[in-house]
Amino acid sequence: MKYEWRRQEKQLYGAKTTPVLVTVPTQSCIMINGEGNPNDTDFSNRVSALYSVAYAVKMAYIKTAKGEYDDFAVYPLEGVWQKIENCELIKEKLRYTLVIRQPDFVGEDGVCAALERTKHRKLNPLLEEVRFGTVPGETCVQLLHVGAYDDEPVSFAKMDEFVHAHSLTRTEEGHREIYLSNATRTEKNRLKTILRYRVK
């Protein structure tokens, strides 16, 4: 049976255009850090490096699967965004971590083995920057943003209003974006992105 995150984790990935409070469990991920404008080539190269590892993990798992699931859908790309300076948003001054979550049933050993094999097979220096990590569980507010990335402030304003109305406190300046659409194949006004940040 194939594990489908869209169907089996609707609480996390079935977000609506109105804000909700969610409990995000501890997650295993592959990730790579970056800095600068997400429209630049370096960003897309880092995305490609991460996906090459994600699909290597998937193919290796299919060959050796013995549990309940014999395949899985690769999780969507995520971006954790921070501003370098506490000032107006300047894309060239952004810091980010690109993330692709890994299924719990694959395990750290399986992910790391696939990562090492990919480093040896593909002559991409950025693969040396890809790493395995664990993201602790957290309480978050999230919302589905439909439209261009540059229009996200409107959705963040809705989230901030929700936080205030429910007597919550935002605990980080940065935020997480989960990209449900392929930006190279989708019109800007139809892009679907889950916006998420931690609260208490």
Identify the residue ranges that each predicted region occupies.
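A solvent-exposed interaction/effector surface
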Residues: M1-K200
